[in-house]
């Protein structure tokens, strides 16, 4: 599927067809969103229109409707289109990665890794209507810290990939770079300048944990899927996800709508399960919450010297004590914290850890300050070292020290700037514990970890899409270890 690569200035309103990155962009949909960063080729526009029509027939539509839609299938056959999304990398280790692909119809998917003088085939994995036409192929047996070119084969034929992509395994040494951020709100995933900047920094992984690829579609899972289709047609997202392994969790806008959580009023548990299924199939994560009826979107993984725990603050929320994460996820989190062996532990939450922005609106401060205190005391009592708190939701970017009665200080870093939106985070410097505050700018967070030092160190940086470092702070592991 030939896609034109656009590289327009994200901070120039003309690059966004007259829109500014604010509430206006939250309301646009369909072709208007697809063409936001520049007019897509006619074949891409027509393909999306056909898929969107197939997915809009009812609130329960899946990619089975696409696979069975005669107009979609005839169009794809006529234009030699065999995949609708991907390749998207995830679940990276020192020896391998998973490659996610969405096909046009049920198909056999393989991945060919090119090595010196030879190649190796991984798979096959079958995409099906049940899997939402997704196949995730496990690639393993690779060497640590090496880059490999690759091809995706669908029914034995390589698909054209019109952006530069490669697989890079995790390094074996104790140094790693991890990019992160939240709130692209769909359109930020089309920002080629920002994608190019992240790619230039060559992070081993990208963590995104809220307000990502679907926007306020409530229980209409067909429209959720249509939003993800736009994501997969953005050249910027193709170039980023085809080379940088991505790990994701969600927040309110991916979930149902603004500030919604638990089972929202006038909706059902069946609706909640359906939305969870869309999210879990649309991303390439190592796991998704509990592997039973309890559900959720959370997991733990290891990236070099770092344990990464990505939390779900939406699915289980009740407004009661321990109701922010739910009892089950809270106990799971404690078990994971005690089991972590990395020099640093990165914990992501889709909303703010502190109450300093909007008085804790839609976050721990309003819903579960007791649960937050229980968690902080647990970390302190067990002297769990190296904990870093990453947050999102409040548009803009801000950071805080969190001084504790124990004498320990937690650090919170937020980079809710992947969509360039203005928001309350830009006013954070009014608080005495604030570290930085920015708004109305495209930027991403970055953690540079060096665990080879006698006292391992992490350097946080907030990086503008232009490459300018807006803020940086270095912390020793000893500074992130609660006192005895």
Role assignments for model-derived ranges:
Residues 1-484:
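Metal-dependent phosphoester/phosphodiester hydrolase catalytic core
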